């Protein structure tokens, strides 16, 4: 039971750190993180399209992030490494954040979603699914998904092959949840796939934002 509580606590802490970094590093094209325990402390790998922004002038920003991770989140001797995302269009976290930013700038959700869908597919993705949840068109919250191509939906392939990302857009009507799933180029497709040749949009029956 103690072990279960430990893993739950660590998972919650990683989620909170991820949310913090997403807000702090949006302009860097933040694409997620990986936290690993080492004999010397805690190794934190930050994935970003623009590593220079994460590091900051003279390393100022990365030193500040290190201090916050240690003092605010309780990481033991955090050592931050920054890994460049070679193609941000194939990183679901980056695309979710960018789509959320587009919504916050006032771009209509359908226009923003289809633009993201085309850009991702044009960069070689085998498939993509975008799900927007919240008050998109009026008082009632609903969920709409946009999808195209080949996407593993269940089992181990869905966990290991598909890049997944989540972000939130803060609008006057409320919070819009943005989920993106991308099947990268070259992924070996299993039997459990959904085949959609053309872009499709559908409303998902739901009374609450995801």
Swiss-Prot record:
The lineage of its organism: Archaea, Methanobacteriati, Methanobacteriota, Thermococci, Thermococcales. GO terms for molecular function: rRNA binding; structural constituent of ribosome. One of its GO terms (biological process) is translation. Binds the lower part of the 30S subunit head. Residues 17-86 form the KH type-2 domain. PANTHER family: 30S/40S RIBOSOMAL PROTEIN S3, SMALL RIBOSOMAL SUBUNIT PROTEIN US3. HAMAP family: Ribosomal_uS3_A. SUPFAM superfamilies: Prokaryotic type KH domain (KH-domain type II), Ribosomal protein S3 C-terminal domain. Disulfide bonds: none annotated. One of its GO terms (cellular component) is cytosolic small ribosomal subunit. This is Small ribosomal subunit protein uS3. Belongs to the universal ribosomal protein uS3 family. It comes from the Archaea. InterPro entries: KH_dom (IPR004087), KH_dom-like_a/b (IPR015946), KH_dom_type_2 (IPR004044), KH_sf_prok-type (IPR009019), Ribosomal_S3_C_sf (IPR036419), Ribosomal_uS3_arc (IPR027488), Ribosomal_uS3_C (IPR001351), Ribosomal_uS3_euk/arc (IPR005703). The keyword Transmembrane does not apply. It comes from Pyrococcus furiosus (strain ATCC 43587 / DSM 3638 / JCM 8422 / Vc1). The gene is rps3. CDD domains: KH-II_30S_S3_arch. Part of the 30S ribosomal subunit. Keywords: Ribonucleoprotein, Ribosomal protein, RNA-binding, rRNA-binding.
